[in-house]
Amino acid sequence: TCHAGVVQCKDSFYGQHEPETKPVSYELMNKWEAWKRLGCLASEMESAALFIVASTLHVRCGSVFLVMANQEREKQGLDNPVAHDTDMAIRVAVEAIRKLIKEDAE
């Protein structure tokens, strides 16, 4: 399954795991709930630097992620399979680059 949309990028990825055990638990939990209400699809901590550098260099940038598991499904007691196969994510990224190259050539 593929999704396109907003992803939260932060500097404390592991703050989302057991946030109630952290000194700023109230803040972490409230921020995550706010991101969910805004339609955020996932959380990660690598892409922000790429987008900053791309903006500075005035070049396009994009990101493709493999969502390994869904902590929200887990909290609800739903099936939460863990994915490790990166093949689909790689194919999506390659196809996106092909489309950009084609558009640039037109």
Regions flagged by a language model, labelled:
Residues T1-E106:
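Glycine-rich phosphate- or other oxyanion-binding loops that anchor nucleotides, phosphorylated ligands
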